[in-house]
Swiss-Prot record:
UniProt name for this protein: HTH-type transcriptional regulator TrpI
Family annotation (PANTHER family): HTH-TYPE TRANSCRIPTIONAL REGULATOR, HTH-TYPE TRANSCRIPTIONAL REGULATOR TRPI
Keyword check for Transcription: yes
Organism: Pseudomonas syringae pv. syringae
Role, per record: Activates the expression of the trpBA genes, which encode the two tryptophan synthase subunits, and represses initiation at its own promoter.
GO MF annotation: an example: DNA-binding transcription factor activity
Length: 298
């Protein structure tokens, strides 16, 4: 019997997919495409010679073998994170490494970075976005700024900053702008709506809040990541749905409009850090972010 381990990238893709029960969410967390995660899962199944998932309606269900590997891989990765964190304990002089999605970084945090650095000069903030696993337990990451829904994991210290609000947005350059800008929300049922595979429930959830049957919506062009979705909306390619803070600058500049406003979701913008990685700077950062949101909401 071979004792060779499967490729590490394949194990990471499996561990994230099994933990989140979603290929799309695993892709978003690992900041790769849906297809890349699917390929790594196939590599792992071929290496082991067994099936780890079976189709369950529109989702996936772990096989018995998959459940065994999920438990083992979760324990192994957690142990690796703990040991690596112990080996790389930061001193007070080390930068504070904050992880967040590229979309949140580019569209919300960067416009405020000058004020943050001026108000917290000793923080020495280092931003981690783009490639990499944005799991807050990842070695080398001090905290994670993320939209997420409670309940929070027991091993996490979480600072809730504000409730998430989402809504449809479009550009004045969009061909349907004049027709839709003063129409009721139900008028969107006739549009091919821009959407992202990382948040497949965004449109259906919004529709239910507005008394619209989700099945009446028509999906148009899809995008792997939210950043590209919003770029498409700014370019006038259609109506997108987005968290309010990520389109705030575009709304102020007139590049986008939100005729139907924004609605709260169960999610929060929150700062996460593992309980085992207590750092007083996280509290300072959370206080600054919350004050910034109160001073200038989005």
């Amino acid at each position: 019997m071979s004792r060779d381990l499967p490729p590490l990238n394949a194990l990471r893709a499996f561990e994230a997919t099994a933990r989140l029960n979603s290929v799309s969410q695993a892709a978003e967390q690992l900041h790769v495409t849906h297809g890349a995660v699917s390929r790594q899962l196939k590599v792992l199944e071929e290496h082991l010679g067994i099936s780890l998932f079976v189709k369950d309606g529109r989702g996936l269900k772990l096989t018995d073998a998959g459940a065994r590997l999920r438990d083992a891989s979760a324990e192994a990765f957690e142990r690796l994170r703990d040991v690596c964190a112990e080996l790389t304990q930061s001193s007070a002089d080390a930068p504070f490494v904050l992880g967040c999605s590229g979309s949140l970084l580019a569209r919300w945090l960067i416009p405020r970075l000058g004020r943050l650095n001026a108000d917290l000069p000793d923080l020495r903030l280092h931003l981690s976005a783009g490639d990499g696993d944005l799991d807050p337990r990842r070695p080398g990451l001090d905290a994670l700024l993320v939209f997420a829904e409670p309940p929070w994991p027991a091993d996490m210290q979480v600072y809730e900053l504000t409730s998430e609000r989402i809504g449809p947005v479009m550009s004045p350059r969009f061909a349907g702008y004049e027709r839709l800008s003063h129409a009721p929300a139900a008028a969107l049922c006739g549009e091919a709506l821009l959407h992202t595979t990382s948040r497949p429930q965004a449109w259906p959830s919004w529709a239910q809040q507005h008394g619209i049957e989700p099945g009446a919506l028509k999906h148009g062009q899809g995008f792997e990541h939210l950043y590209y979705l919003l770029e498409a909306a700014v370019a006038g390619l259609g109506v997108a749905i987005a968290p309010e803070p990520l389109v705030a600058e575009d709304l102020r500049a007139g590049r986008l409009v939100a005729p139907w406003g924004f609605s709260e979701t169960p999610a929060h913008l929150a700062l996460w850090l593992p309980n085992a990685r207590r750092d007083g700077r996280a509290g300072q950062l959370a206080q600054w972010l919350k004050a910034e949101l109160l001073r200038q909401p989005y």
